[in-house]
């Protein structure tokens, strides 16, 4: 369990804070952050980052989570009709509350987040005081560390840091923090608090999962485990309270992400397509995708994230040295190498072709792109800028 938590924390929590600090080197502008790799590659990478935390993965996942943690436990049964009906209602609400913004959403979000955190803390503390069981004696997977690292991908907290950095910076400016040093200091403090809180919650939930690990197999949905644990610890009332809070939290998250994604798409298309049209398309796609469930969306997202994360991580690291890097090849060569290796790895996992990719170092934990990217970085250092 320790290795799994370490791996998960590294990507889900640690990398999110580092990413936030990295994007501050570019005035919290994601387009400036990716610009060193060239105009077209930068546009593609930034587009994929925004799509992952928006319409492609996270927005549909909010709808699926709202059903699996909010409605399904209350209903007590599940079928295709119920999840379809809930997905339609969920994204209809998302559409109307995004196209016609309401203060109700802000009010719900303001009070709901503290309530949801409090509810999770109560569940975790109760689970620590009265554990439901002992962790399984042997791991059910081959690479516990690798699984933790890859699961950290799925939170996409790193991408969120890059995507919302500009919003956080604007908020600080509106509060009177006009000096860049002040802004960076406050961003670090707020990021540290947020990541620490996330870390404690993730750690607590991991522990709760470990206490029932002997009871469940790998085929059980993660959301179902949380629901079952909550019911065992706090009874039906606790399950219903968590369900309602989860549904509303997912709804406010969906509205915020849909709005931000719509504005981004309007900007990159230079307002050739209406905002409301993008919102409608996002909600329709979210409805269809949410029906496959959280686990299904996670499976779809895994290969996409496996390709998008490595180049993003390299740019995050190099961002701290941008003032000393005079040759863009130092950004481009390792980044393109990471994309290439990651793409081949994903292709191998899907088809069985190009098995040679498994010979590379760190393949067992899914990080065979690191050494080749480092070699590419070293080579780029010796190539003179024309």
Where are these regions (language model features)?
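Membrane-interface loop-to-helix entry segments
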Residues: 98-127, 301-313, 333-339
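Membrane helical hairpin/interfacial module
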Residues: 2-84, 88, 92-95, 99
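C-terminal membrane-solvent junction of multi-pass transporters and transport-like membrane proteins
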Residues: 313-378
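Helix-loop-helix connectors at the membrane interface of multi-pass transporters/channels
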Residues: 64-82, 173-174, 254-281
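Hydrophobic, membrane-embedded alpha-helices of multi-pass small-molecule transporters
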Residues: 51-55, 125-132, 141-205, 241-250, ...
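Select transmembrane alpha-helical segments in multipass membrane proteins
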Residues: 39-53, 84-88, 143-151, 232-249, ...
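Extracellular/periplasmic helix-exit of transmembrane alpha-helices
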Residues: 196-225
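Membrane-water interface regions at transmembrane-helix termini and the short interhelical loops
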Residues: 26-33, 90-112, 174-177, 287-299, ...
